[in-house]
């Protein structure tokens, strides 16, 4: 293997040694299989190809200053995948099997885990697909769960710095009672046009309002939104927002640090009142928002005049990263050591 330049890694795919797989057949999950193949041999009538029976997750393994390799809240990823399975009628993967497969694939690809000082990490992508053949619209009778990994650099090339976003009314990410709360591929397909147009206009990502009234904050790109004002951490409550594990963790840390926490509808006009704002998720942890433009209304909500992250966002970012890397005390038991 040629030497990897850890410091120049993008947030992209790199071939590693192994992935792990498990089949669901005849009403039961089978044994864990190890593969070095990057491709899948799929039936042309598989439900994942025609009817969107596909759900995935994203988490990371971190090489820490003490030399150990930790993962962050993988039980929450297992629970969210189970929720997605219920939402689109796929068999739920037991938490124990999920965690065993994460552990196995990380250990088998240890040489691809970036060193601590690089700022990079090992991205873990669990994927569950309907493989059984169906021509009518109904659930498959056979499924494949697999996990592959890839070393990745920061999601945003600028690292922990503030980025501009743009409100879109032209597109909706998900319907109010649709699949927005599940991590399924269709939600991301629905965001591709909006994302492309936002990037083409010079923005970091698109910013969605609620699909029903176009009045309330929904998601920003593929991440959850939060705003800070009056020592309060405020994040939207909506039936179409993916429950972010990072956001859930930040809410707890905000409370730990003495902030009030509110999860409630946020009208667009309230953006004017926030002292800080950010997007949060596994990929970037926190991406501070420099400003949110509303091109249709000719308005701009500015949170950072100098482009630097705000003090509370910075404090929360450092605290969460500290827990993930085993630097801060893990008082909530969020991390698990996979490699000593």
Task: Label the predicted regions.
Residues 1-105, 127, 134-340:
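Helix-start/capping segments and mature chain N-termini
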